Amino acid sequence: MFYTILCVGTGGFVGAILRFLFYFGFAQFFSQKYIFIATICVNIIGSFIIGFVLNIATTYAINYNFKNFLVTGLLGALTTFSTFTYENAVFLNHGEISKFFLNITMSIILCLIFCFLGIYTAKIIH
């Protein structure tokens, strides 16, 4: 059990750093007011990877600790529902209704599409 916890924690450490670097890099190229797009991007990337990995796991034996490292740890820290929720609350609070609906719509639709693409890619590979 301790080793599994260590794997999840290490994955979370890596995922949190990747998310920070992604946001930092995004902020260097775009205005801070568009930082919500970085949240959409990390959630899309995470959706693809989780769809891919968990579909592969239905056919191939993936090490339990590696799966926990990747899915629970890394993807859990990389993707974020709390930031998504906060950004939408800020949009509503500032009366930015179009950004609110755009963010919700893009996040849900694109994340579903990329999750299915991950599943489909995994099926093609095996």
Swiss-Prot record:
Where it mainly occurs, coarsely classed, is: membrane
Give a GO biological-process term: cellular detoxification of fluoride
Keyword terms of this UniProt record = Cell inner membrane, Cell membrane, Ion channel, Ion transport, Membrane, Metal-binding, Sodium, Transmembrane, Transmembrane helix, Transport
Kindly indicate whether the keyword Membrane belongs to this entry. yes
* GO CC annotations, alphabetized: plasma membrane
Q: Which reaction does it catalyse?
A: fluoride(in) = fluoride(out)
Which membrane topology term applies here? Multi-pass membrane protein
Activity control summary: Na(+) is not transported, but it plays an essential structural role and its presence is essential for fluoride channel function.
**Which is an annotated GO molecular function term of this record?**
metal ion binding
Cell location: Cell inner membrane
Q: Which residues bind Na(+)?
A: G76, T79
Superkingdom field:
Bacteria
Residues annotated as transmembrane? 5-25, 34-54, 71-91, 100-120
Q: Which family does it belong to?
A: Belongs to the fluoride channel Fluc/FEX (TC 1.A.43) family.
Q: What does the function comment of this entry state?
A: Fluoride-specific ion channel. Important for reducing fluoride concentration in the cell, thus reducing its toxicity.
**Stored HAMAP family:** FluC (MF_00454)
The protein in question is named Fluoride-specific ion channel FluC
Instruction: Tell me which species this is from.
Output: Campylobacter hominis (strain ATCC BAA-381 / DSM 21671 / CCUG 45161 / LMG 19568 / NCTC 13146 / CH001A)
Upper lineage ranks?
Answer: Bacteria, Pseudomonadati, Campylobacterota, Epsilonproteobacteria, Campylobacterales
